[in-house]
Amino acid sequence: MAQAQIGTPLLTTRQAEELHKSILAYLSSKNLASTAATLRDELPDLAEVTFDTEKAKKYEGLLEKKWTSVVRLQKKILDLESRNTLLQSEIDNATPSSLSRRTQDPTNWLPKAPPRYVLESHRLPVTCVAFHPVFTSLASGSEDYTIKIWDWELGELERTIKGHTKAVLDVDFGGPRGGTLLASCSSDLTIKLWDPSDEYKNIRTLPGHDHIVSSVRFIPSGAAGAPASGNLLVSASKDNSLKIWDVTTGYCVKTILGHVDWPRAVCPSHDGRYLLSTGSDKSVRLWDLAGGRDAECRLVMFGHENYNLCCAFAPPTAYAYLAKLAGLDRPPPLGASAEFMATGSRDKQIRLWDGRGNCVKVLVGHDNWVRGLVFHPGGKYLLSVADDRTMRCWDLSQEGKCVQTLTGVYEGFVSCIRWAPPVVKDADAMAANTKSGGTGPLADTVVAARRRAATVGSVNASVQIRCVVATGSVDGTEGKVRIFAN
């Protein structure tokens, strides 16, 4: 009977070589020459290894970084185990009424005060936030020139990213098949790409705009004429242009002109076919990317009386509610995109538009500039934040009635709002993602499932709404990020 092999290696040959080089670099940095020489003698793969300047920089401090990463991971595991024990205790001792609160329908969940966490570290106002599509990571950008990465589940700061030389104005996660990237844009006229799988290393800088870059978004794959890999990024700038970039090459593949003043915000439709842009010329423009080389401006909408600051496409889950506002006999097909849109402005108003360019509703209630908008994934609500220090929730099933106003939570202007992407419950997809470390083709299963859910306009059995909202604000002179969660 064959015996089990003893000492089966846990690392691949390449991983072992990298570990050996890291140990050698560590010993060399500590001036332990004899120990390093002994290691070279006993490990054949190190015999010919020499460290030039570039290679030394690559391995310098790598062992320490890996060690501290393991320590942080162990702490997270302990914290999660503690939370799991607490939740299990709550379930064991729960009454039927408390269980019903726990299992409330996520399509009706709205953020409540107080927030779960108030995250403090930025020295100046927070301008933007973005959720990682898979992990519990949140990026925030600030006028202090930095990006900070938080674990929103634990309420902890993970790292500070430096690279921009002026205010960071927008951030977004996305990217090509095989790995999620973080994109950022700034008043320094550049867009930067960061790799979350490599300690958020700056892998590319995209110059090309001639003025402030105020908005950046990854374009979902599936657009007609767009690569299936999802490697396109759109940006908006004070140079009056929109630009589309290929993040794998760093080249600008399309410049879109039409705005006569600063297009402050841009967002793509869920299928990547359309772009919505708006800004200081008070116009709202709908662009069709299906035409190939040139983007076609399908609609130009006017109605706001001051600069427009934000825009959003309605998800298909909202079509049934918005169709009634638009006076339609039946809602558009769930597979359609760009059927309804929302914009917010310095005129303190939010306007809802249909796909024919008609303003179907004006939402009035904010007392100052409307800075950010996000549709509830369930489609029933629209959330907004403004310089009046409030977050408002508008019920689209009640003709856009404001059904909730969060006051007393913020000490200053509220600049941005994002909703966490849904959870993929499919066991195979999650297992695949875990094995691939959140990158690679297996991880794409998770992202693809979310896109399918958006396309069909409903949250199916394998995709669940995540009741987590993040906002950014200025409190005094400092910026704060607030996490609202169920």
From Swiss-Prot:
InterPro entries: Dynein_regulator_LIS1, G-protein_beta_WD-40_rep, LIS1_N, LisH, PAC1-like_LisH-like_dom, WD40/YVTN_repeat-like_dom_sf, WD40_repeat_CS, WD40_repeat_dom_sf
Domain notes: Dimerization mediated by the LisH domain may be required to activate dynein.
Record keyword Ion transport present: no
Organism annotation: Sordaria macrospora (strain ATCC MYA-333 / DSM 997 / K(L3346) / K-hell)
Domain of life of the native organism: Eukaryota
One Gene Ontology CC term in the entry: spindle pole
Function: Positively regulates the activity of the minus-end directed microtubule motor protein dynein. May enhance dynein-mediated microtubule sliding by targeting dynein to the microtubule plus end. Required for nuclear migration during vegetative growth as well as development. Required for retrograde early endosome (EE) transport from the hyphal tip. Required for localization of dynein to the mitotic spindle poles. Recruits additional proteins to the dynein complex at SPBs.
Pfam families: LisH_PAC1, WD40
Gene: PAC1-2
Major localization class: cytoplasm
Summary of subunit composition and partner proteins: Self-associates. Interacts with NDL1 and dynein.
The LisH domain, residue ranges: 15-47
Localization of this protein: Cytoplasm, Cytoskeleton; Cytoplasm, Cytoskeleton, Spindle pole
Sections of the chain in a coiled coil: 70-95
Protein name: Nuclear distribution protein PAC1-2
An annotated Gene Ontology molecular function: dynein complex binding
Keyword Endoplasmic reticulum (UniProt): no
Annotated GO biological process: cell division; establishment of mitotic spindle orientation; microtubule sliding
HAMAP family assigned to the protein according to its UniProt record, in alphabetical order: lis1
Annotated keywords: Cell cycle, Cell division, Coiled coil, Cytoplasm, Cytoskeleton, Microtubule, Mitosis, Repeat, Transport, WD repeat
WD-type repeats, residues: 121-162, 164-204, 208-255, 258-297, 303-363, 365-404, 446-485
Family membership noted in the UniProt record: Belongs to the WD repeat LIS1/nudF family.
Gene3D superfamilies (UniProt xref): 1.20.960.30, YVTN repeat-like/Quinoprotein amine dehydrogenase
